[in-house]
């Protein structure tokens, strides 16, 4: 509940900054927009489930609101998983050497993922204010590169737990949580790409 409240607050503040209108989005229209937009993602059901909780903060047909919200959620969940994995090393006193090294590497690459997603959230906000096509495309290229790299970081963490010799319980716990984050990040990247494509055609 605390994490969801944190995500809600960050999204509320971020979208308030981005909005040029103070009008409250219609819940039904926003829900329809979310469902339609999520069909372009690799995990549409997860996409809808993740974003629907914040439908009232996403303006109808506003692809930037949608992409921004998806990125913020991805960032919050990546942070949560990084904290979880770090705590796991402290709460579980005995690890095989292979497990310990895999967890250590995982914490490092997840930290990189968090940094890249945080950069992406800020850059996407700046891209929304771009008045020239070249400036917009440059900023969106940065966002796409960083989110893609964040997804690679998350996948790299999973690779460390792919060996059969890896302990079952630790492997299941970490894989379950990191797979979820990777899927959320994948969806966010798809929505970022969608925003970049739609917005770019509007420039002269």
UniProtKB/Swiss-Prot annotation:
GO cellular component: apoplast
Glycosylation sites: 26
One GO molecular-function entry: pectinesterase inhibitor activity
Entry keywords, A to Z: Apoplast, Disulfide bond, Glycoprotein, Secreted, Signal
Expressing tissues: Highly expressed in roots and etiolated hypocotyls. Expressed in seedlings, leaves, stems, siliques, floral buds and mature seeds.
Signal peptide: 1-23
Gene3D superfamilies per record: Invertase/pectin methylesterase inhibitor family protein
Protein location: Secreted, Extracellular space, Apoplast
Annotated S-S bridges: 38-47, 106-157
Role, per record: Pectin methylesterase (PME) inhibitor that probably targets root-expressed PME and PME3 in a moderate pH-dependent manner, mainly in slightly acidic conditions (pH 6.3 and 5.0) and to some extent at pH 7.5; this processus relies on changes in the protonation of amino acids involved in intermolecular and intramolecular interactions. Regulates de-methylesterification of pectins in roots and affects root growth.
NCBIfam families assigned to the protein according to its UniProt record, in alphabetical order: PME_inhib (TIGR01614)
Family the UniProt entry places it in: Belongs to the PMEI family.
Subunit and partners: Binds reversibly to PME3 to inhibit its activity; the stability of the PME3-PMEI9 complex and the inhibition of the pectin methylesterase (PME) activity is pH-dependent, based on protonation status of amino-acids at the complex interface.
Protein name: Pectinesterase inhibitor 9
Provenance organism: Arabidopsis thaliana
Gene (name only): PMEI9
